[in-house]
Amino acid sequence: MKKKLIAFVCFLLVSLSGLPQLPVRLNERPVVLNTSTGALKGKMVTPNQESGYPVVLIIPGSGLTDMDGNSAALPGKNNSLRYLAEGLAGKGIASLRYDKRGIASSASAGKDEYSMRFEDGIKDARGWIDYLSKDKRISGIYVLGHSEGALVGMAASVDNPKVKGYISVAGAGRPAYEIIEEQLSLIHISEP
């Protein structure tokens, strides 16, 4: 009888292991960072626990890329950064992703295009790091940048004692001017 019970429990466990897992409940809330030119808006996703979790600041790439990883210059949506945030939360890691100044929900914080500088992005990332450092639920801050966001994140993280780690996703491996020239050559502008 005991062997049959053990066999049944083993069978049950093996059978249940093949079932899809229930989705993790995410806690997502809007966040705002006030700057001298206006409000930068983002979303913070936290795992389903009270405190003691690390957070990843997710910095989007170049151009018209929003906090979810979608570019207004490209057709469709991939939501890559949103999916990343959800996946991190499922592993007990919080994240904060934001729209850069002049983009999507942070459009009003943008200066005119000719006045914007790379340093503005670094200053904004540092502002978000300071924002996160005041949250007592967080056990450590990590910065993740995608594409141009990797350069911004690296500059914002260097010599910053508030940052425990830095992650570059598809960061530049060659001089920025080469990348910009290449990207501009791929843009097809039709003449009227």
Regions found by a protein language model. Name each.
Residues 21-51:
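N-terminal cap/lid segment of alpha/beta-hydrolase-fold proteins
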Residues 50-51, 56-87:
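Short, surface-exposed "cap/lid" segments of acyl-processing enzymes
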Residues 79-107:
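Conserved alpha/beta-hydrolase
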Residues 114-134:
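Alpha/beta-hydrolase active-site loop
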Residues 131-183:
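Primarily recognizes the serine-hydrolase "nucleophile elbow" in alpha/beta-hydrolase
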Residues 185-192:
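Residue-level detector of conserved catalytic or cofactor/ligand-binding positions
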